[in-house]
Amino acid sequence: MKFIGIIPARYASTRFPGKPLALLGGKPVIQHVYEKVAAVLEAAYVATDDERIYDVVKSFGGQVVMTRTDHKSGTDRIEEAIEKIGGEWDVVVNVQGDEPFVAKSQLDTICHCFDDPTTQIATLGKLFESMEAVQNPNSPKIVVDNMGFAMYFSRSVIPYVRGKEMSSWLTHYPFLKHLGIYAYRKDVLRQVTQLPQSSLEIAESLEQLRWLQNGFKIKVGTTDVETVGIDTPQDLERAEEFLKAQLL
């Protein structure tokens, strides 16, 4: 199977404008992401709607494609990008442009999800380590079936452990945190971008619920590697400390 990584990157961000170009350890954040993805997959491209990002990616020797400015999601952007890139790709891996520490093991895990021929879409989950984190609505929870396919994603705490103090729930059930890396069979990517928003997606503000609600199967690979995304300038400061710790 042939895997291509596409990294959607926008300059406009409410909380941190220009974050793909922010310097981390002397290199733009987008360069960190690109180099991690390019080292594992057969090909990697940045998909952007901003000439500043386009120029920076070109300057460090990366592959980049310009996309429209009116996309409502990164999924729509990568679908346009793969159509422009062309080629005979089996699976498209979507890594966010603000994930400079995406690990080789995570990319390997999500690719291996497609060893199962019934996998249409894949994503990653990691076990929660505290109930405080489980209760954070910004950390979506996943429940999976016995075959490793997602049954539901929610910002609410699911499942509810009846008859136990919430402080002890982690000892009774392995709560799984969703990490926002996706991969799609190429034909499935085209199909999901044609779907209208669904009621569950609107309720939870989770795009992947649109796919589940329309009957697509999402395989969940598990990882023990935490992601360190950058959404704010404060996140960038923490990322600098994380990078320094890695280099020690």
What are these regions (language model features)?
Residues 41, 87-89, 117-120, 216:
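Short, high-confidence coil segments that cap the C-terminus of an alpha-helix
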Residues 48-49, 102, 184, 231:
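A conserved hydrophobic position in a structured secondary element of the catalytic/binding core
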Residues 104-195:
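Conserved core of the sugar-phosphate nucleotidyltransferase
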Residues 45, 51-95, 99-109:
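Short phosphate-binding loop-to-helix
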Residues 87, 169-248:
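Conserved alpha/beta core of the MobA/IspD/sugar-nucleotide pyrophosphorylase nucleotidyltransferase superfamily
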Residues 2-48:
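N-terminal glycine-rich phosphate-binding loop and ensuing alpha1 helix
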